[in-house]
């Protein structure tokens, strides 16, 4: 059995790490490189960096900090933000990233997933999915351009259908960003994770809602996700990664203990 992964998420805006609630009202957390170093030292399995306004601004992630991060950490990291071509991805990987993640650009051009997978291999290609639970229709809807409140919009994709589609096109991993839960720390949406796990045959990463060590345990035990991504509980030092992994190991979760 592959070890489960603990993945701190660093949302980047204007060169700094920020964090919002339900993808809104972002506050500055700190500088990128020191936070990356801290999480690597605490025992994170990998890091994910989202340049949250790159797609909505029509630009590619700033590659200068990608190179700085690569110099100071020795764990894998994934970068996302406005990657719209094989050339964009090539530059980011050349600067030191281990994976690239696409979200809004994949929705605009689904063939991008296949082109990237063909060039770099599926293991290198992550698709992020921003999913919103609509109570009226009792359905999960995919959203686009979520880094900018003014441009955020619902797409025509139901989350379940998009999960199936991106796998067919070559996604090697899926990060499910559950917008309703984002930043509120009341637990991952286990119902949604279980539904998507049933149709997802590549590694599935839960994102949005972690507030306690028990929430991580529930995601691994009850939804069988491959990794759990979180931000605010790590940024605000509510949960220490090393202590979290020790707890999960004691609960029988296969995990790399620091």
Swiss-Prot record:
Provide the active-site residues from the annotation.
11, 130
Q: What is its main location?
A: cytoplasm
Q: Which InterPro entries match?
A: Aldolase_TIM (IPR013785), His_biosynth (IPR006062), HisF (IPR004651), IGPS_HisA/HisF (IPR050064), RibuloseP-bd_barrel (IPR011060)
Q: What is its EC number?
A: 4.3.2.10
Q: Which Pfam families does the entry link to?
A: His_biosynth
What are the record keywords, sorted? Amino-acid biosynthesis, Cytoplasm, Histidine biosynthesis, Lyase
Supply the source organism for this entry.
Yersinia pseudotuberculosis serotype IB (strain PB1/+)
State the reactions this protein catalyses. 5-[(5-phospho-1-deoxy-D-ribulos-1-ylimino)methylamino]-1-(5-phospho-beta-D-ribosyl)imidazole-4-carboxamide + L-glutamine = D-erythro-1-(imidazol-4-yl)glycerol 3-phosphate + 5-amino-1-(5-phospho-beta-D-ribosyl)imidazole-4-carboxamide + L-glutamate + H(+)
Example GO molecular function: lyase activity
Q: Which GO terms describe its cellular component?
A: cytoplasm
- As recorded in Swiss-Prot or TrEMBL, the protein's gene is named hisF
Assembly and binders: Heterodimer of HisH and HisF.
Name of the featured protein: Imidazole glycerol phosphate synthase subunit HisF
Q: Which EC class is the enzyme in? A: lyase
């Amino acid at each position: 059995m592959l070890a489960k992964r603990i993945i701190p998420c660093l949302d980047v805006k204007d060169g700094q790490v920020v964090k919002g609630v339900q993808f809104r009202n972002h506050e500055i957390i700190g500088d990128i490189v020191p936070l990356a170093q801290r999480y690597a030292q605490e025992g994170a399995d990998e890091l994910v960096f989202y340049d949250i306004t790159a797609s909505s601004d029509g630009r590619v992630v700033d590659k200068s900090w990608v190179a700085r991060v690569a110099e100071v950490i020795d764990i894998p990291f994934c970068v996302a933000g406005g990657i719209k071509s094989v050339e964009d991805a090539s530059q980011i990987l050349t600067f030191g990233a281990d994976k690239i993640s696409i979200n809004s650009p994949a929705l605009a051009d689904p063939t991008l997933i296949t082109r990237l997978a063909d060039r770099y291999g599926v293991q290198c290609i992550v698709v992020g999915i921003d999913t919103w639970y609509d109570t009226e229709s009792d359905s999960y809807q995919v959203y686009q351009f979520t880094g900018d409140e003014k441009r955020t919009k619902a797409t025509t994709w139901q989350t379940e259908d998009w999960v199936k589609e991106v796998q067919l096109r070559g996604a090697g991993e899926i990060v499910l960003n559950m917008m309703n839960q984002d930043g509120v720390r009341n637990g991952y949406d286990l119902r949604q994770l279980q539904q998507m796990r049933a149709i997802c045959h590549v590694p599935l990463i839960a994102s949005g809602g972690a507030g306690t060590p028990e929430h991580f345990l529930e995601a691994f035990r009850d939804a069988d996700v491959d990794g759990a991504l979180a931000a605010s509980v790590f940024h605000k030092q509510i949960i220490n990664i090393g202590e979290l992994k020790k707890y999960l190991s004691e609960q029988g979760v296969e995990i790399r203990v620091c």
